[in-house]
């Protein structure tokens, strides 16, 4: 079943202004998204340009800006929030109080478990609630180290999800961990949520320690296990499924010494150096680098290789070297704060490309290291270089904060530093330092907070957080940063980071609050959306960023957030500012302007002295620059009288600055859509099936992410819809206008007392800004609505068989999908969405499922993409497709007619060619005609297309041209169908052939192919139906198609009032006039309008055209004469008689023209000039003068010249003689190579041909001259004596006249005969002539025979007298005898 594609979807009818608004809003989002992606790398925040250019920070007040005197302070802005406390079991506490036990405590975040070892036993429990206890007591030795490992793939049974590695002084034991009630391969991050933890009782592996005390165990993501030895060595436990020839199932490798160390007992491994135990191992899984820290502060770097399977030590730096380097960087700082190092932490490439390692000292100093050159993300580690020293709070000159000290635990995670410092023996202080509030600010600015923790901290760990995968596709891969976006950019979709702290009192779980969590805290604390602290929050983060954060709460649809949402909405409008005009800084900004003009993003002047706040241009959360281009629209004052008036007061070159509300909406929307906005819609994935590769097209975005984005978009859309009713326009605040104007008036101090003009100008500027923002917000609102519906459609497609739906699309749409982004889908690709919806519905139809349900769902989900008309279209399509499966002919016709009625309702919007193609397949040709005509009528209800056509198709009538073209496109569906039927009716039937193999006959590849007879029948029926149309423009289109299809006979059978005017018009204006005039005379002749037919034929003959040959022109004239005669026979109009006479004269001249052309073709066709002349003779009919002067005379066509003067009645004896002489000489010249008899025959034929034409007009047939010239030629050429007489006899010259001519020639005594020595030649000719008479007297009429006989006798007597007077000779005697014999015969006839 072919796909309906676009026929399923209504064509776009959106106004251009709406499309332009979407484009403008899209550009705003593009720029905001670009700004969000331009966050600095950690090395940029630390102002480190290269590894050899180290820097120091933490000594300036602005490094920790919220803590200095006179700086912005938000006391109620917490950094962390306690979730819960879970105490330890009382029995364990009692055990821990015993001094003789060996105990350790830690956290396994991947399985949400805390663990505790007491001597040889290990306990694990869920730190969330203290439940789900598991323990292992199968060891006899004290546990020294514990590690959790995600096993290598393919080694263990699927139910073994993790490995628990326990090290004792004697051996290393590896246990399996599984979970109850969890299906294998569920892929859940925290499996323990779904079932209890189970420790497998029997160890999977056990190997001896060789008397090596192991202090810590760590693993890589790919399952490698590393152990730190008290002897200062780094070990690895290598394990595999089965033992090999040269390898054990499980073995221990010492990477600090020989690679064969597992073969040598530790007792034999002597060392001359003092042991420096390794106390910490950290692994950078993002780069495959391993770091170790020893008890004495030595840091070593190991490269695990690109694939994580290698092992090589590349660098080792002692604590003294680190302290020396730090001292050289921070020269004014006491070096004691740089040691000892209590913790090292990996900085993954998702946070920084240039900094790889962080070390924290006991004084809270952070030391940043790099292992390779900057800006080379793929480089392998080759060094360990200190690049930055970050001092903790308290080191600035004016700081009153107590410095950290006695730090014994530290945790660094994504820019957040947590440190526990010993306040006393019973309590710790927890420090939280981070730059989440200032992620874009350079140099790095951080906030800090301290809180007291009960008990001594044993472990501090970050809980594995939910991470949204970046959607990286071929279209956006060059725009997506490698590092992760700051928290402020992702806070709408990621929960706050969770941490757990373990102490002897139990587990403390807490969140690191995001800016949105801090705002929620302020709103709840202040019980409303206003208050000084909330206002400070907006100033701290700047209006636009604060508004974006505020929208997360305001747009929340959660029931528990209902009250907070209302408070956030109030804060959004109260502190979100207003659109303004920004003027050049010709006047200082007074302190009473407030956050609107004094906003750091827009202020052109510094903050006034004495302000309680720092210059916010160095405080803003994104702070992408002083003037973000996305949020201001420059407006020139040139050429605008009002602005020129303002320039008198110094207000030159203002530009619109949108409010924080407007910008916040843009920011929030860009962050919701940011992960998919410029991503490809689809990606190609290759699957293997039955040993072959299959390429499938899949959605680039998983459905879970779509659901998340849709939820956020829905909240934003509802917020915009809910708050667009304010009188100030969408999201406007009517109460702020007066205040803003007052503030503006407070800023400007006009001179010369022109206060009123200034007030008016400022008011106008303000309203301009408000209007501009209103228009922009309306566009954004449309973009949000369109985005929601487009993504909802995409989700719906993903919920179905996406690959199948896309596979049903035409190849061009599939290729277009690959290069289409989600932004394009939202803003531009109406055709793509239409095709996808059509494919979806076709899948339902193909599966014999009703489309009503999915159609209603589409209308509810995406009405902008699938309207009521689309639903009608879908219903019609369903009826059409169902009709294919119906066996009953009457039922099928009913369904087809019903589908036609549905399609006709929206005929101007359906994909007409596609629907008609399907109607053709089911042979519903009536539907093709009626639907196409209905569509044409609906597309042009006012008949503008016909008006355009009848008025000569003027170029300036753009609307007329458009409607005209739309109508023709509709008609084309009918004519294309007619053409298809014509082709099938003329197709040659398949000839029988011998089967290629035995068996039943193979069916034709196209069962829908019509037979010749069927096609012809359907054609006739469809043509009759088309002829009934009253649509004049369609009739014209049908006529034109019939002409192009060479079906003129069918055309002339049409009885329509539109045909004659169309043919007349086309005969005048169309380039193919000949064809239309030819049809026109045939139309007139068929309708017995003979006079009109004759006149059209005459025009055809006269037309200057290379399309008509001269022969055709003669045929046209001949037909015209016949039609004219028929007309005169019917009516006796004098004009018709005169016209007939003109035609006959025209025919006579035309024949001469044809004679000239044929003569040129026959004699001179190889000359190029002659070819031109022949073509010219074809191009038009010419008059006599032109034919003579330009053709007959230049080319010396004597026969043609004779015909011309004969036609013209021009008599010039000399010219006539010359022409006859030329004719005879030309004929003799042409036959010079022939024999005498052939030459005589050829000349005779020519003379007889011409003689019969001209013999009746003696002026043009000078017999005397012709006979004399011919006889001279006969005598010269020694031809037969009777040649001329025989020729003249064939011409029909009477013997008496011929005798008269010869007699006069003889008597003229022409000396020519003596010169050629044939004085008796004429007498011989006369003898032949008379002999013919004697032998056949019937050559002379009976009534004239006696007189002619007497005349002959008299003539013979005279000839004998002449002969007697001649000197005697044999010839004379012979001729004398001949005449005497002839005389006797004549006397007998007398």
UniProtKB/Swiss-Prot annotation:
Q: Which InterPro entries match?
A: Nucleoporin_Nup133/Nup155_C, Nucleoporin_Nup133/Nup155_N, Nucleoporin_Nup155, Nucleoporin_Nup155_C_1, Nucleoporin_Nup155_C_2, Nucleoporin_Nup155_C_3
**Which residue windows are coiled coil?**
none
Sorted keywords for this record are: Disulfide bond, Glycoprotein, Isopeptide bond, Membrane, mRNA transport, Nuclear pore complex, Nucleus, Phosphoprotein, Protein transport, Translocation, Transport, Ubl conjugation
The segments labelled Disordered in the record are 598-632, 984-1011
One GO MF term, please?
A: structural constituent of nuclear pore
The Gene Ontology biological process annotation of the record reads: atrial cardiac muscle cell action potential; miRNA processing; mRNA export from nucleus; nuclear envelope organization; protein import into nucleus; protein localization to nuclear inner membrane; protein localization to nucleus; RNA export from nucleus
Which range is the signal sequence, renumbered to this chain? none
Give membrane topology per the record: Peripheral membrane protein
Task: Give the free-text PTM comment from the record.
Answer: Phosphorylated. Phosphorylation and dephosphorylation may be important for the function of NUP155 and may play a role in the reversible disassembly of the nuclear pore complex during mitosis.
Q: Which residues carry this modification: Phosphoserine?
A: 1056
Task: Identify one Pfam family in the record.
Answer: Nucleoporin_N
Question: Which Gene Ontology CC terms are recorded?
Answer: nuclear envelope; nuclear membrane; nuclear pore inner ring
Cross-link position per record: Glycyl lysine isopeptide (Lys-Gly) (interchain with G-Cter in SUMO2):
739
Main role? Essential component of nuclear pore complex. Could be essessential for embryogenesis. Nucleoporins may be involved both in binding and translocating proteins during nucleocytoplasmic transport.
The subunit structure is: Interacts with GLE1. Able to form a heterotrimer with GLE1 and NUP42 in vitro. Forms a complex with NUP35, NUP93, NUP205 and lamin B.
Q: Which family does it belong to?
A: Belongs to the non-repetitive/WGA-negative nucleoporin family.
**What protein am I looking at?**
Nuclear pore complex protein Nup155
Its lineage reads: Eukaryota, Metazoa, Chordata, Craniata, Vertebrata
Gene designation per UniProt: Nup155
